[in-house]
């Protein structure tokens, strides 16, 4: 792989389409900026103009991170705000599933299964991006969700709703897409691994758990 030089980075961020795409995604979101290892910009911060992107690249910014939450004014948020106050200034949130696995093969497979579960639940507006190392970010925009759920505004159901959605998807994956066949764990009826192969990837750990169907408690077998 060719070395990622400063000139190559600047050439990339000079592109108008790249700048516009970043600014469009950053609209009404808090933007975190990292410079090098462990050096972060002030909070809260925003990106407003396309030229801001190139300016940050010139300042050696190494990564940009947008908030899941969407705000009326990102600069007005503070860690001192109560949940009620945050609800008043939050206009929505995007669902972000952060797949971070130490094994590249399993990371790709896990991402595939999450996307499959979303699609089988009628979700069509799905994004997926490589997030570095062996990880992926799966995104579903706030516009994909109903405005209210059981009389509660969806925008106010953060972070509870994303957590419940994640657990729901994990349950679908574990109960529908993973089976045991010929002493192997089979994912999506296609990808099979023996327990030893998984131990080689992840070390000694418990790969199979039996739970009671009614109470969901772990059972000894």
Name the predicted role of every residue range.
Residues 79-87, 115-116, 123-131:
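Catalytic micro-motifs at enzyme active sites that drive phosphoryl/nucleotidyl and oxygen chemistry
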Residues 1-94, 101-104, 110, 148, ...:
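DNA replication initiation on ssDNA origins
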Residues 106-124, 159-173:
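Long, well-ordered alpha-helical scaffolding segments within enzyme catalytic domains
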Residues 94-97, 125-154:
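Histidine-centered divalent-metal-coordination microenvironment in nucleic-acid enzymes
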Residues 127-134, 179-189:
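Short, glycine/acidic-rich hinge or "gate" loops at secondary-structure transitions
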Residues 70, 96, 99-101, 111, 115, 118, 122, 126, ...:
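Generic hydrophobic/packing signal
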